[in-house]
Structure formats: C-alpha cells, structure tokens
Amino acid sequence: NLETTLPFGISPESSSEESANIMFHNIIITYGYVLALASRQKSELSLLDWGGGIGHYYLISQKLIPDLIIDYHCKDVPTLAEYGQELFPKAHFYSDESCLSRKFDLVFASGSLQYSQNWQHTLKALAEATSGYLFITRLPIVHQVASYVMVQRPYEYGYNTEYLGWCLNKDEFLSIAASFNLRLIREFISQVSPYVNNAPAQPQYWGFLFAPIKI
C-alpha cells in the first residue's frame, strides 16, 4: 500500500490490505505532523522508535517526507529486532537499552510505553535520550480514576498473544513527565479503545508531544 497513492489508512502490524481505515489514517497522519515538526529546517533526522517492531515506521517516515534522510533506530524484543535488521540493513535495531546511550532529534513510542512494568523509569530514560521532541502515543488514558493494569488480547492487530499493560491516569502521567523536565507541546486523540471488562473506567487512547526543557 505504501507504493501507491492510496490513503495511509493501514495498520503496520496487520496483514490486512485495507487502506481506508480512519483510525489508522489518523495515527499515521498525526505521526506525520510530529515528524514534520521535528524535521523543520533539517535535511537529516535521527529517530528512535521505542517498541517499533520490525521497523514499519522506517518506511512510513520515508513515504511521509521523501526528501528527509532518516537515521532510524528501533528497539524491540530480539526476534523482531533481528528480523527488522534483515529487512532494513541501513537501519539500526536493538534488543537492549544501549540505544539510550545517545540523543535523538525525535524519540517515538507508539503503543509501547504502557507495557513497561516500571513506566516511570522508561519515560525518564526516553526523556533523557531526547534532544528535540518526544512523542508518546497510543497510550491508554483515564481521567477520573487511578491508574490500573489491564489484560490486552490484540488478536485483530496481528498479535496472537495476550499481555498486561497500564492504563494511566492522565494527571499522574503528565505530572511525572513534568518532573523529568518535559514540556507538553500538544495532546492528541489517537484511536478508539477496545472495551475493557470490569474496568473502573474505560480508557481513551491519547498521544502527547513533549519537548525537553533546556536547563
């Protein structure tokens, strides 16, 4: 689908060839806005894709801004990192946290921060690796209740498994982010949330764009 002029309404993780999904179109075009903002007045951009699977956003980024040279770095579990490196030998893949030893123009975590048991530690590490912008998106958020843990079964997105993830209270999340010297630039609604059985409140999936406060 990326080789055509069809809409960006595709799921990077799904085998479906549908290109008119409004939710996925919103996710990718929102990312395009962030990528354009981070690359202003730049011919080359360094990007860390935290939890980026096999590197789908390497190709998506190239299609969104074709003349931008992207120094792409992706962190995920070993199986995905190894396969991604085979697919994209010019990119950089990691199965550990050694990618956090440097800074990036854009740090991007889409649908991944909530799976860190100690999400505060991960957020702090991502903030410290950010020189330009930090974009946390597809994050389950609640407003009136405390953060809680839920079980996710993402079969429709191509993952034949289930796992635990956080649903974070928005005020708590933003307070922790501010404590790491992150300035909130913009909030986004990223996607429709699946129903969570027996939850104290149903989550909404939000995105948050930050910039580090220069000290």
Annotate each PLM feature.
Residues 52-98:
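Class I SAM-dependent methyltransferase SAM/SAH-binding core
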Residues 105-119:
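A short SAM/SAH-binding and catalytic strip from SAM-dependent methyltransferases
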Residues 126:
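Class I S-adenosylmethionine-dependent transferase superfamily signal
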